[in-house]
């Protein structure tokens, strides 16, 4: 579960390393976000000589969370880290590659992330 002030790693090659969640989208009383939800983030650390600068505000989609997710068949899945993928203003992925596994729940939200990911759990 991701909330305001949560830090996430960026798992694409956009140039950002770590981001801070500043807003969970989806209503005024919505506190938590999970896999497949869109959040507003600010970039905290970047790769040297990248086009993304520290402090940029952007939208991101969550691809991995530490909190376990219950699936339709009753099984649970959880990951080792909280990770997201940065989006541009039109909602497309900023990077061209995704590192690490992503959750199967993203198929209903964004198919391009699933096709770029090396492993879908």
UniProtKB/Swiss-Prot annotation:
SMART domains: Ribosomal_L14. GO terms for molecular function: large ribosomal subunit rRNA binding; structural constituent of ribosome. Keywords: Ribonucleoprotein, Ribosomal protein, RNA-binding, rRNA-binding. GO terms for biological process: translation. CDD domains: Ribosomal_uL14 (cd00337). The keyword GTP-binding does not apply. Signal peptide: none annotated. Pfam families: Ribosomal_L14 (PF00238). InterPro entries: Ribosomal_uL14, Ribosomal_uL14_bac-type, Ribosomal_uL14_CS, Ribosomal_uL14_sf. It comes from the Bacteria. Disulfide bonds: none annotated. GO terms for cellular component: cytosolic large ribosomal subunit. NCBIfam families: rplN_bact (TIGR01067). Belongs to the universal ribosomal protein uL14 family. HAMAP family: Ribosomal_uL14. Binds to 23S rRNA. Forms part of two intersubunit bridges in the 70S ribosome. Part of the 50S ribosomal subunit. Forms a cluster with proteins L3 and L19. In the 70S ribosome, L14 and L19 interact and together make contacts with the 16S rRNA in bridges B5 and B8. This is Large ribosomal subunit protein uL14.
């Amino acid at each position: 579960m991701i909330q305001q002030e949560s830090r996430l790693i960026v798992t694409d090659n956009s140039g950002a390393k770590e981001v801070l969640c500043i807003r969970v989208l989806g209503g005024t009383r919505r506190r938590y976000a999970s896999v497949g939800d869109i959040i507003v983030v600010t970039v905290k650390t970047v790769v040297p000589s990248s086009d993304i600068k520290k402090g940029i505000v952007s939208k991101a989609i969550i691809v991995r969370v530490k909190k376990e997710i219950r699936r339709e068949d009753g099984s649970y899945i959880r990951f080792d880290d909280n990770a997201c993928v940065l989006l541009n203003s039109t909602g497309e992925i900023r990077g061209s590659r995704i590192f690490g596994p992503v959750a199967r729940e993203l198929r209903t939200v964004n198919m391009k992330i699933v096709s770029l990911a090396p492993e879908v759990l």
